[in-house]
Amino acid sequence: MSENQKEVSPPQAISVKSEASSSIFSKPISTSSPAGLAAAQRVTPGKLSTLLLEMGPLAIRHITQTLCLDIPCFKDLSSSKQRRLIMSAMESGDKEKSVVFEKIGWGQWSAKRVDPANFDKELEATNFANAKVKDLISQESQRRKSNNSNSNSGGKVEMPMKVEHNITNIDGATTPPTAVASTTIPVNIKRSKSPLAAANVVYIDENALASEDEDEEFDEDDHHLHYQNKSRNSSNNFGKSSNGDPYSFGRRRSQVVFADSTPENIEHEIIAQKIRPLLRNRRRSSIKPHTPFISKLNTHQDSSYLSPNTTSTTTPSNNNSNSNQAKIDLEKLTATSEPTSRRASRLSVSKESSIRSTLFPNKNYLIVTTNPNSKATSVSTSPKLEEQMNVSSNPIVLSDKEKHRVASQHLNGESSPQLVPHSHHQPHSDTDEEDWESIGAASLRNNSLAPNIDSVASSTNGVVSPKPTNPSFTNSQNGDIEPPLQHDQQKHEQQPRNGEDNSAAFLLMSLKS
């Protein structure tokens, strides 16, 4: 028995599957076939009016399911043919019972009794209203699709008041559970424009304004970090922005984009026009603090570099050669060579150190050269130097102790400084690290003057004070100017001498060599 059951069971399973597959993949019958014609003829307005008056309002799918149960072969028709048969019966109306079919939205239909005398007029008006609702629903379906793609937009479309009134008058007892669930479908759909949509039409480019604020901060830092390069053109282009500056405020404006000339756009444009002058004034006020900084930098330079009437004092020499061409002639520093002369002083303007006051030409020093062909010049234009130069006409006699000290300096190979401080009462010091008031003894105020012209002319190398002739010292004179010595060595600076003392010193130097 078990073997027979095993043999019979597979054919039974196969037959069940074949029936299921035939029912699933069954081809819908045509309306031209006898079964299709019989099913179509039984879909009448009277049958639909009876169904909707008893169970309405119903959706099309519920009406279709009820007709499939009542009419044989109706389920074998295609869904589109079923819908067309139902719609044609509703549009014709039930003239025998004076019932018209009204669409109340979203596929729900109801049956309404009318006056038999006005049946034709009511039927025409109802069909027109149904077509209107159909158009609204189709438009809503399209709007819902577009709303899914654009989540920022939303709105509200109101259905006719008549439809809402009909919904409220529906008897809940006659509505099946499926119809009650379908009545929860909203009739009003929100579809109005959001405030963000209007903001997208006209807007002020906030990115440009933010970048201008960043440029202002960067430009302020740029003035402090790179003012050395910018101050070169400050005398010619003061208060003007260069054309090549990528952070020029003159070319930056608020960008306003127009999409349509609606009243909202005009209102936004008026607001933008009121904002622009405030932004320009703000940018101008941010530039103003930089201009005193540039003018202060220009006034910080030495007066000898800014004034064309630069005075200098020279000492005559016997021979002229090309050995001193590498040195800067301070007599030629006029307004034409202003960029070259300003460059040395500008290099150290941000570093308050003694480099500027010792290496570069300064008004606190009197430059004395050791080459007979060179010139002893002064960059200062102070009246104290002129007074000292006027007093230097009288010869100065040294004591025996000072002569002995000078001779010992030559034997020991000590070198005298090149820069002699001549102004001991300066109103302002270039650096805070050096106190020029304490440099030098009180006697040097009267003795640190230019040497006698005869003694300088009679010397072999034009030395004001005795100096050794070693190669390292000569190379340092032809190269950079040496800084001043320490405070204790500056007490021995450049003692003027008469002709006999110079002769004795040079004799000792010749014996040493």
Swiss-Prot record:
Note: Present with 639 molecules/cell in log phase SD medium.
Keywords per UniProt: Cytoplasm, Phosphoprotein
Residues annotated with Phosphoserine modification: S254
GO MF annotation terms: DNA-binding transcription activator activity, RNA polymerase II-specific; sequence-specific DNA binding; transcription cis-regulatory region binding
GO biological process: cellular response to glucose stimulus; positive regulation of transcription by RNA polymerase II
Biased segments, Basic and acidic residues type: 134-143, 488-500
Subcellular location: Cytoplasm
PANTHER family: PROTEIN STB3
Location of region: Disordered: 1-20, 134-159, 227-249, 282-354, 373-437, 450-513
UniProt organism field: Saccharomyces cerevisiae (strain ATCC 204508 / S288c) (Baker's yeast)
Compositionally biased region (Polar residues): 296-306, 373-396, 409-418, 450-463, 470-479
Predominant place of localization: cytoplasm
Any one GO CC term of the record: nucleus
Known partners and oligomeric status: Interacts with SIN3.
Family: Belongs to the STB3 family.
Keyword Repeat among record annotations: no
Protein name in UniProt: Protein STB3
Record InterPro entries: Stb3
